[in-house]
Amino acid sequence: MPESENEPQGVPQDVASIRKQIRAFLNKLAPNGKKIGNAKWGVYAFYDYDGEPIYVGQTNEMLRSRISRHLTNQRTDAVAMNVLDPFEVADIEVWPLWELQNKNSGDADSKLILNSAEHTVFQFVLKKSSFGAVLNEGDIAATKPLKLPTSMRGCIIPAELFDQRKHPDVRIARRATTIAALARVISERSVSKGLRRTLMTQAVRLQRLATQRYNETSGAVPTVDPGEEI
């Protein structure tokens, strides 16, 4: 038996490729010459394969750390509660707040700026969404709008995987599974109305995708005699 057969295998190749793409995006240089993932303070948004915004978040620990936890095995509340399925994320957009880079994570004034930035981004993506909604469990508290810094956006799915991941049948199956898992969480716990809204939003997203897939499928629905099976 070859020695290699006794060695533990790493992550699947497609997962490794996506993680590599995530690192490449976070290593892109901002206009100030710094890697965008190294911004300590910032706001981020995730988009699906249709370009629809699906989630907004903030961090004061580092964009790289927070985004990686969402999209890899390091669980976040949003992933654990089946609010966000990392499989749905095709693009990331980030708004680094470089002016706060040297501020302590507990700095009150900096937190106010971060909260304003997140609220501004939240309103921005809601206007971009054809559903008028994202999957966040709660609304971002209203604050004074902030002039946002220049954002950077990129696709995290390698070209060789994109068409497979975007295939509507794959996405329908995945989204239905996520909805079932979220519905189970809701049935077993006392949850917020926001989580029920997330379930509703996911159901609407699934209905649209399933309807689009049905309408683009050629042929007619079969007709059978009573008692016959297709």
Where are the predicted features?
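Short, hydrophobic/aromatic alpha-helical segments in well-folded domains
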Residues: 42-43, 66
